[in-house]
Amino acid sequence: MAPTVERKNINLAPLKAAGVPIFFIVGGPGSGKGTQCDKIVAKYGLTHLSSGDLLRDEVKSGSPRGAQLTAIMESGALVPLEVVLDLVKEAMLKAIEKGSKGFLIDGYPREVAQGQQFESEIQEAKLVLFFDVAEETLVKRLLHRAQTSGRADDNADTIKKRLHTFVTSTAPVVDYYESKGKLVRINAEGSVDDIFAVVVANLDKATSKL
């Protein structure tokens, strides 16, 4: 049996009272979403949260929960969705205390159930920004990145497997939010500035309704 993680009782009243907008950011490795997130944060003053970073930070912290997470990952099991959600909630509450104007939640949700759980326990996302790039382009970008970073083990086969995993897990998420009218599909094949112009147009429209 896989190790378990004890859940915390988290008071979300300050977060709900703040009523700030939440945006989910979805895009494959090499889609350029990291660069776009940096630009969005600089322009709008939103708080950028990455569920992967929050998990890594908790493991590094040496806390009892971090030790439980390490045990789960070492056993080859997946970290339960609700544990990731607790980490996100705690990070959001800390940011609200510091006066956050809203959130960009990166690499989230990874599956439909994760998005539904977030929205039922916290609040609905205003928009889901999907940075859409053709698979061939992603492979080229990742191979180029591997050469320049010295990660020669990132060969075409490994990269294609990573992309396949991303596409198969993310397709239902994209379809789900598209059906709810919340998905903004951004063609992320162009220049950084061209892509950002599309992002800004959509975020301005969404935030003007607040």
Curated annotation (Swiss-Prot):
Keywords from the named record: ATP-binding, Cytoplasm, Kinase, Nucleotide-binding, Transferase
Keyword hit for Transferase: yes
Pfam families the UniProt entry points to: ADK
Enzyme Commission number, as recorded: 2.7.4.3
Top-level taxon in the UniProt lineage: Eukaryota
Ranges where the record places region LID: 144-154
Entry annotated with the keyword Cell division: no
InterPro entries hit by this protein: Adenylat/UMP-CMP_kin (IPR000850), Adenylat_kinase_CS (IPR033690), AK1 (IPR028582), AK1/5 (IPR006267), P-loop_NTPase (IPR027417)
Ligand binding (ATP): G30, S31, G32, K33, G34, T35, R145, G190
Matches recorded under PANTHER family: NUCLEOTIDE KINASE
Family in the record: Belongs to the adenylate kinase family. AK1 subfamily.
Protein purpose: Catalyzes the reversible transfer of the terminal phosphate group between ATP and AMP. Plays an important role in cellular energy homeostasis and in adenine nucleotide metabolism.
Descriptive protein name: Adenylate kinase isoenzyme 1
Source organism (scientific name): Caenorhabditis elegans
Organism lineage string: Eukaryota, Metazoa, Ecdysozoa, Nematoda, Chromadorea
